[in-house]
Every structure is written in C-alpha cells, then in structure tokens.
Amino acid sequence: VLDLASFPDYQSVADRFHKSAVEPLSFEQGVYGLPETQTFPVLFYRKDILSALRLAIPRTWDDVIVMLPMLQKSKMSFGLPSAIATPTGGMNYKNLLLLLFQNGGELYTKDAKATLLDSPTAVDAFSFMTSLYTDYGLYKEYNFLNQFRAGSVPIGISDYSLYNQLSVFAPELEGIWDFTSVPGTVREDGTIDRTVPGEVNACMILSKSKQPEKAWEFVKWWTSAETQAKFGKE
C-alpha cells in the first residue's frame, strides 16, 4: 500500500479530516489511506417510554445498572452493540474498546507493534463488559432498529448512522426519541469520561499502481466534502 504522506500536498488534504479519522490509517511516519467515512456510537433513547417508567437518561455505567431492574421488570432491556460477531465474521470489539478507553487504557503500545490487551485495565474492562451479559442479562444479539421501534429495547448504544434509519423506517416515532452521549466512567476527580471508539472506512492506493498521481487525484476528489455531500444526497 502506498504511503500517501509522500505526496507534496498530503498535509493540506489531511487537514480536511479530524485527527482521530487519520490516526488508524497511520503507522510510524507513513499514512496509508484517506478517510471515506467515520462513525462512532451514541446513546439512543425513547423519550415516551423512559418518561412512563420515570427513568432518567443514564450518565454513567452505574446509572445503567441501576435502571436495568426497572426495564427488565417491564420485559425491556438496555441495548449494547451485538457481542456475537460482525458481518465479516470477526468479534465485535467496540464495547471493549469503549470501556477500555473510558478507563484510561490503550489498545496498542506506544510503538504500535503489540497490543495491551493483557494490561490490568484491559482485563478489568473485559470483565465488566462480560458481566453486563452474564450478570445483568443484556441481549448478546438482537435487532436494535426493530426492537427500539417496538419498544422492547427503548434505550441503547448504536452508531450515529442509526439516526437516518430511524427517520426513514420509523416515522411514527418522530418526536418521541432522541440521542445523546454514551454513558461514561467516573474518573478519580469526579468528572465523567465518555470516550468512544471510532470506526473508519478509507481509500488507499496500491504501491504497485502504474498511475499513482492519477489515483491520488481521484482519491482527493472522492473524499472531498463537495463530492461526498452530492453522493449522500443522490
């Protein structure tokens, strides 16, 4: 894969994007892709159902645990992204990363050549994540869109892109749902850390390309705000 930072105008192009979108595409001094999309999780909730149950929007994970008995008593649950697998067959690690980052942990060593998944912070995050399923009975796999619409999962975490799906496929819910930041972890100083992992899809250029300059021009055009806005509308 071609190092895009080798192009003279790379930095001016990279400035289009948030730093967090470029970071996963970088290694040492090289950058091997331009972000095409970036998503991150937020907390969706049904205002009508939470109001009927007299439940407040949870600010922390402790708040989530406190509200679970009331939800489950009404045959409802809090939704986390599926813990089973991704469409490509891999494990869904988003929940683990969310809890890891909120507790001050890191996924990789500073040189990015090894993971830190055996660190005490990572082990604690993994233990808490699994306890949400084993001890508190959250669904391991479910359809958030359908169950949020039906009301059996009136609150849960999903990528912000669910906003568009709900607007199109559940027009009857207009005005009775909303979204906010995910529940966070309380720091030692009393503040709440609501860090979430992002997911980036990117465009790359193969190092064996015979026309790297033309490929670079195409990638710049495709990832521009004007082109992406037009693509999204059409």
Label every PLM stretch briefly.
Residues V1-P41, I65, N92-N95, E174-P183, ...:
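Hinge/lid segment of periplasmic solute-binding proteins
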Residues P24-E36, P41, D63-A114, V153-I155:
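Extracytoplasmic/periplasmic solute-binding protein
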Residues G30, D48-I49, L162, E226-T227:
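Short, well-ordered alpha-helical scaffold segment located
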Residues P41-Y45, L100, C203-I205:
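Short glycine- and hydrophobic/aromatic-rich loop-to-beta-strand nucleating segment
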Residues D48-P58, E106-L107, D135, K208-A215:
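Short helix-loop capping/hinge motifs at secondary-structure junctions, enriched
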Residues I49-L50, V66-L71, Y142-G156:
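Short helices/loops that flank or line small-molecule/ion binding pockets
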Residues M67-M70, D111-K140:
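Glycine-centered hinge/linker elements that transmit conformational signals in sensory
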Residues Y163-L173, P183-E234:
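C-terminal lobe and pocket-closing loops
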